């Protein structure tokens, strides 16, 4: 209810400024004891050999640098994913690069992996004191040639390995040039092979297994989804996140800002991402768990993703439009049902 009063004020601000103000405010409320933990009784969901206190997580992108982990966790999330992070700090694309389309409950972003770099992220994670399930989302620097992308992912994997509950490999952002080519069969075969080999080496070295999740795009043909599913199983990936933002503009092309360049998220992505989940589930047959993301604007949207085959879900744009109550409503609905982990 409180968010319904605050949202019009936040929407008067530039979207990126509002984003910063929101994170700063949450941190202040947490530090001063004015942000109580929202907890709902829920049977833990076991996915990737991890016990998630509830199946509703925060998607990567909201807290890129891990500066607000504990405060965001207080909103009732069962897990938090930070990033995308790259080996070296980078400023991302020029501003403006974040656009609201309120008539469609949508957002377009072309942020470009702006982040403080993996070393600073690790410092922030350590300082947060967060003890819940934490995913760290990794990517490549914009100036790293595509043929050297594997090196960037391996650098990040080595550095975050002991600090993450699981690691997400982002190969599906539309805002880093050529990145989505890593979803092609040849490139993906090489990347997954290298990641699995390094994960095995790190597991042997540290005596700890940190799962790997691959985040894919919603703009894939059925044949591509089939190939990706086969490669995920071949290389024994631990999870797949479906999906990232879309380059399609159905439902917003006629609206102000609707044709801005970048990835579209929010309500227009809901059905598209759920369709990808359903197709993946059909191919994977529970061999690899699916984390559903993209256009969860209501608890019902999340439930439909679970019914399509997801074991967990993640929220981001829905939080911007519906506020923190979306988290508790979604947790309440999903935890009132019997959920089966992959």
Curated annotation (Swiss-Prot):
Descriptive protein name: Dihydroorotate dehydrogenase (quinone)
GO cellular component, one term: cytoplasm
One Gene Ontology term from the biological process aspect of the record: 'de novo' UMP biosynthetic process
Subunit structure and binding partners: Monomer.
Cofactors demanded by this protein: FMN
Gene Ontology MF annotations: dihydroorotate dehydrogenase (quinone) activity
Classification lineage: Bacteria, Pseudomonadati, Pseudomonadota, Betaproteobacteria, Nitrosomonadales
InterPro entries: Aldolase_TIM, DHO_dehydrogenase, Dihydroorotate_DH_1_2, Dihydroorotate_DH_2, Dihydroorotate_DH_cat, Dihydroorotate_DH_CS
Domain of life: Bacteria
């Amino acid at each position: 209810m409180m968010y319904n009063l605050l949202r019009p004020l936040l929407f008067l601000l530039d979207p990126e400024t509002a984003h910063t103000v929101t994170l700063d405010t949450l941190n202040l409320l947490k530090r001063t004891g004015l942000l109580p933990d929202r907890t709902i009784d829920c049977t833990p969901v076991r996915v990737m050999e991890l016990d998630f206190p509830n199946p509703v997580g925060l998607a990567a992108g909201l807290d890129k640098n891990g500066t607000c982990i504990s405060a965001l966790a207080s909103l009732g999330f069962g897990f938090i994913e930070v990033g995308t992070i790259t080996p070296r700090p980078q400023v991302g694309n020029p501003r403006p690069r974040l656009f609201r389309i309120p008539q469609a409950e949508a957002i377009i972003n072309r942020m470009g992996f702006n982040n403080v770099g993996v070393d600073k992220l690790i410092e922030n994670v350590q300082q947060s004191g967060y003890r819940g399930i934490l995913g760290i989302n990794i990517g490549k620097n914009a100036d790293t040639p595509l043929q050297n992308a594997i090196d960037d992912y391996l650098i990040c994997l080595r550095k975050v390995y002991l600090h993450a509950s699981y690691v997400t490999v982002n190969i599906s952002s539309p805002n880093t040039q050529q990145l989505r080519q890593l979803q092609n069969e040849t490139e993906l075969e090489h990347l997954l092979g290298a990641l699995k080999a390094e994960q095995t080496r790190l597991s042997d070295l540290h005596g700890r297994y940190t799962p790997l999740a691959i985040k894919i795009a919603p703009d894939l043909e059925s044949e591509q989804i089939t190939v990706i599913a086969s490669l995920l199983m071949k290389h024994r990936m631990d999870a797949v996140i479906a999906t990232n933002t879309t380059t399609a503009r159905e439902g917003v092309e006629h609206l102000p800002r609707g044709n801005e360049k970048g990835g579209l998220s929010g309500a227009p992505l809901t059905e598209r991402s759920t369709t990808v989940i359903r197709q993946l589930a059909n191919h994977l047959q529970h061999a690899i768990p699916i984390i559903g993301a993209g256009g969860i604007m209501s608890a019902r949207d999340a439930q439909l993703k679970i019914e399509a085959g997801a074991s967990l879900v993640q929220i981001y744009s829905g939080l911007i439009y519906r506020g923190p109550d979306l988290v508790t409503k979604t947790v309440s609905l999903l935890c009132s049902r019997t959920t089966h982990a992959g």
